Amino acid sequence: MDPNILWQARNDGSALQEEDIQQLRSSIRGTVVLKNEASEEEYNAAVTRWNNVSIRLATLVVYVEDEQDIVKCVEFVNKHYLDVAVCSHGRHSYHGASSSTGMVIDLGRMRRVSVDKEAMTVTAQGGCIARDVELPLEAEGLATVFGAVNETGIGGLTLGGGVGFLTGAHGLAADNLVSARMVLANGQVVTASDDENSDLFWAIRGAGPNFGIVTEFKYRVHKQGPVFWQMLFYSPDKLKDCVSIVNQMHNISLAQKGGDFQVMMAYLTPPGYPDLHPGLRIFYNGPEEKAKELAAPAYALGPLSVSGGMCNFSDTTRIPPYLEFEGFDRYAASSAHLDYPLDENLLLEVFTMFRNVIHKYGHHLLHPSKCILDLRNYEKVASVPIDATAYSGRFDVAWMIPDLQWDDPAMDSTMRMEVTSITAHIRERVREAKGGHVNGPRDATAIYPNISAGGEEKAKSVFGPNLPRLQVLKRKYDPDFIWNKWFPIVPA
């Protein structure tokens, strides 16, 4: 089936009549913001995203109040054959995740959370951001797995896999999902779990945006106390020294059974400095003394500055001060995997490429533009069979993530090209190292979907060997290809 035929058949709703809009409004409790009717301020607020590159001028945005509102919206989409996108919170580098020129169903008003300490679960509505769930859990001495930033919507994060600093201990956010209540493409409301609609439950844990709108997530939770959290920045001349210890740091992480010690490397310009500096982010789910013992190689390099210490877990998912800037809210990010042991020469090549981009475009790029080397322990993720859920990236690999941030719309395509050229170089070098192929089910082009631009042509890189089964399930649950954003799966 040609996805372009299905996409082109859907319309932007510009031909909707006033009576159509009134019918929608009268059928829901929520609010309809109409492009040609709302004030400029109201409309801009409805379509603005964390990444301004992602803004699409939707004909109508519906702020739903409850599950029944979502059902009515889906029925309206089907009746008028509209293009549609779903916005949990809109914090993604790719526009297709939550923007549409037709209808946007915005879940932002659905943020109720309920903690069941006896059952060790938490239930959260689909419009929650991670902080909405983290804080009430923390008050009970509990936590579940979300991402690195607590302003991220739990919907897209969970349905695409979801990795964070507790992933080493507890797996993906999707691995901690107990059940999900969903509105399907035909407007039907179902529960997906191991016991109900188990094929759908398999699919949404890694490919969820392709199968419906989750109105309610239920997660397993875990006991959680204070953690150790520090950011170490080094002088620019220490880049090679930092790279020289990354394999050692990863091996130390692997040696700590339980996944409690996690490390990430960053290459960015800290506030008050004129150029890029290497940095290491240290996380340990335990006491400071043990953390510093494990991270001894990082401290031995002589950091220029050290910030952080023992803190609540929720403090680790706040955006750090050195990344908080007003404006410069246009982003491009991509990802590519690297196998252990990491090739230090390749890492230096990549960091040099990134530095050249920063120097080339100078004033266009904000200081928080960064290149991240994710060294976190993915053994727990890799211990789950690749076909156990739709999420196929079940390997203990490192991820390189170039992330550019700018403010001039004229630079959008250039910045996207620069980011993808870096990850394309990595993938080519990975292929060369493996003689043009890889062993097993992982392709050298594999990407992490929650930090990459979407597109149907990349579905194979995201879903790997699980794609054929997903295409069959897509035909069952969304034969008309309503959910065609993010990394769309074409029905078999």
Curated annotation (Swiss-Prot):
Keyword Nucleus: no
Residues annotated as domain FAD-binding PCMH-type: 54-224
UniProt pathway annotation: Pigment biosynthesis; Secondary metabolite biosynthesis
Induction: Expression is significantly up-regulated at the end of late growth phase, in the presence of Butyrolactone I. Expression is positively regulated by the pgm cluster-specific transcription factor pgmR.
Lineage top rank: taxon: Eukaryota
Pfam families tied to this protein: FAD_binding_4
UniProt xrefs under Gene3D superfamilies: 3.30.465.10, 3.40.462.20, Uridine Diphospho-n-acetylenolpyruvylglucosamine Reductase, domain 2
Entry-linked InterPro entries: FAD-bd_PCMH, FAD-bd_PCMH-like_sf, FAD-bd_PCMH_sub1, FAD-bd_PCMH_sub2, FAD-linked_Oxidoreductase, Oxid_FAD_bind_N
Phenotype on disruption: Only abolishes the production of pleosporalin A but not of the 2 other final products.
UniProt EC number: 1.1.1.-
Record keyword 4Fe-4S present: no
Top-level EC class as recorded in UniProt: oxidoreductase
Cofactor: FAD
An MF annotation (GO) of this entry: oxidoreductase activity
Keywords (A to Z) from UniProt: FAD, Flavoprotein, Oxidoreductase
General function of this protein: FAD-linked oxidoreductase; part of the gene cluster that mediates the biosynthesis of pleosporalin A, ascomycone A, as well as a third cryptic naphthoquinone derived pigment, all responsible for the coloration of conidia. Essential for the production of pleosporalin A, but not the 2 other final products. The pathway begins with the biosynthesis of the cyclized heptaketide 3-acetonyl-1,6,8-trihydroxy-2-naphthaldehyde by the NR-PKS pgmA.
Recorded family membership: Belongs to the oxygen-dependent FAD-linked oxidoreductase family.
Protein name: FAD-linked oxidoreductase pgmH
Originating species: Aspergillus terreus
Gene designation per UniProt: pgmH
